[in-house]
Every structure is written in C-alpha cells, then in structure tokens.
C-alpha cells in the first residue's frame, strides 16, 4: 500500500483473503475508517511469524474509527497491539481473550471522538 495514492485507497480491497499465516501490521495508512473495507472476509491470523510477539498490530492509523474485522474469529499465536489510533472506538468491546486463545492483548484506547462534547 506504500505506492497507492490517497484518492485510490477507497478502491482497495482483498475480499478473497480469509487467512494470514504470519502477522498483520497496519501502520500510518490513511484513507480508511474501518478495516472491513480492506479485509472484509479475514477470519484467521495464524501468527506463524510474529513481529515482536504480536500477530496483529494497528498503530497510528489516524483516520481509523473502528477495527471492523467482523469475520475475525481466531488469532492462533501471538498478541494484539492497538495503540495511538486517535479516532478509534469500541476496541475494548471485543472479547480479545477468546480470539487470541487466552493471550493478553496490549490495548491503548484513546478517547473516542464520537463521544466527546
């Protein structure tokens, strides 16, 4: 996604991607408010290779409002790190212990802008 222009980002989607064998890192990608647009059918992250013990990293996605990985049911190995996503809401409503096979996620949840006055 490094070479994609902001105006084209809305057209990018990987609907056939159901499983990732390694890790998924999302870092400073603009143009997305939800990952459902990008990975609508992602169900499993295996974590056979990890990034510093993490299988899912969502970091500094400044426009992301919700994770939206509605079909994600299992992270087989590795932890979750979600940090510095200023607009993200509802991260703490996901049962991460069930999805991560009892691993402990690292969640730094900022204030949800939707609820600020």
What are these regions (language model features)?
Residues 1-117:
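Extracellular/luminal ectodomains of secreted and membrane glycoproteins with large N-terminal domains
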């Amino acid at each position: 996604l490094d070479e994609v222009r902001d105006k084209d980002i809305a057209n990018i989607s990987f609907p056939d991607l159901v499983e990732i064998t390694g890790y998924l890192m999302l870092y400073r990608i603009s143009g997305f408010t939800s990952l459902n647009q990008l990975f609508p059918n992602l169900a499993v992250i295996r974590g056979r290779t990890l990034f510093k013990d993490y299988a899912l990293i969502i970091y500094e996605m400044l426009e992301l409002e919700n994770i939206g990985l509605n079909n994600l049911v299992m992270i087989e190995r590795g932890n979750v790190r979600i940090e510095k996503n200023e607009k993200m809401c509802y991260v703490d409503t996901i049962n991460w212990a069930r999805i991560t096979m009892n691993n402990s996620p690292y969640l730094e949840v900022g204030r949800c802008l939707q609820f600020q006055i």
